[in-house]
Amino acid sequence: LERFAKALLADDRVAPIGLGARDSLRLEAGMPLYGHDMDKDVLPAEAGLGWSIPKVRRRGGARAGGFPGADPVLAQLADGAAVTRRGLRPEGRAPIREGVPVFAGSEGGEAIGAVSSGGFGPSVGGPVAMARIPSDIADGAVLFAALRGKRLPVVVTPLPFITPSYKR
């Protein structure tokens, strides 16, 4: 493995990267990270991963159900999720990180969600974040993220933040 890494790095076109670079690419591509944007308690429709359940396994499919958690997963796919993972574009340059609460208004009220992943998106030239928020909030809506005692505007944005060059 070490020989392989050294051979790669001997090429002037190759540079080592770290987790920060990987994370910014993942964020811009709108890809969830287990333990942050999804976990065992977040169903596929909530995580924006409904596409991962084949039609043959859905209600009415030739082999519907039959997998662990099928009843709630299939019900949510059919009826829609109350909350879903969505993109947020903070106004300004301050990155909005994991755990930051999201509010409907600039003052008062309860949090309607929380940022699950966030950071700087070099390809989009600014901060990007993902949060689980109510599904009925339209793209383009302005919400507010509480950062260092202030509520900063964030715009609900479709995922991915960039046009992906990969195929599912």
Residue ranges and their predicted role:
Residues 1-168:
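Conserved, structured C-terminal
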